[in-house]
Curated annotation (Swiss-Prot):
It holds the Pfam family FAA_hydrolase. It comes from Staphylococcus haemolyticus (strain JCSC1435). PANTHER family: ACYLPYRUVASE (PTHR11820), ACYLPYRUVASE FAHD1, MITOCHONDRIAL (PTHR11820:SF7). One of its GO terms (molecular function) is acetylpyruvate hydrolase activity. Keywords: Metal-binding. It comes from the Bacteria. A divalent metal cation binds at residues 146, 148, 177. Belongs to the FAH family. InterPro entries: Fumarylacetoacetase-like_C, Fumarylacetoacetase_C_sf. The keyword Metal-binding applies. This is Uncharacterized protein SH1982.
Amino acid sequence: MKFLSFNYKDAESYGVKVKRKDAVWDLKKVFAEFGEGDFHPQTLLEGLQQNQTLDFQEQVRKAVVAAEDSGKADEFKIAFNDIEFLPPVTPPNNVIAFGRNYQDHASELNHEVQRLYVFTKAASSLTGDESTIPNHKDITDQLDYEGELGIVIGKSGEKIPKALALDYIYGYTIINDITDRKAQNEQDQAFLSKSLTGGCPMGPYIVTKDELPTPENVNIVTKVNNDIRQDGNTSQMINKIDDLIEEISKYVALHPGDIIATGTPAGVGAGLQPPQFLQPGDEVKVTIDNIGTLTTYIAKD
């Protein structure tokens, strides 16, 4: 399943993509009419949280089948052209990111890979697919992109052993880890340079892990104005997904809806010769196999 959150007619909702169509089942409406018992989650985060006691996907499947068979299915579907994409989920706790997790990317920025490099991004930096984000020209002329595979946590845990790590994943998404390279190079921490308004585009969907069975062998392609800048594969990650979850959870309790960005391959603007940073009016597209394409626009003014 591909889950998303959206605005429609000034109201926030969430849903699941209609198969083979650019449309969404509005799950707030579907559950209100066809949900079993009291299972009426109002947000995707609520659904993920309840997944610890109920099978959220199975509840969605049953409700959507009932809507499909009701004779009024179109009342519960909305075309993508009519919605504004939001971040699929806004984590109440953690947006955690890993840097230097691809050797070629670390090398292009002249960084050594000696140990895990971990930072957080402010939840206020999250934005959805097709968003226009500020160009931040008032503070930097070195705005950069980083296409990444994102992990969405599906159940709570800490000190998670590597052998069980994948059990704690609900699904995967796409993240563009927008970075102010000027601030990053001037400061001893990454939080500020990584937390600009609009600095964490995410989406368009969360794809459940059953639909992405080999997340460590998917292509990541980033284009700026249709020019390919990054063309990598998650098989190039130094620390694999289970390694990352095991290491984080030694120190940080993970909860449903938490996001983990797993690092970016080579080809960022700062690593090109000469550097090519994002400019007002640019279009950035990050595509990952079996998830989709995340599009971000840099404001002209």
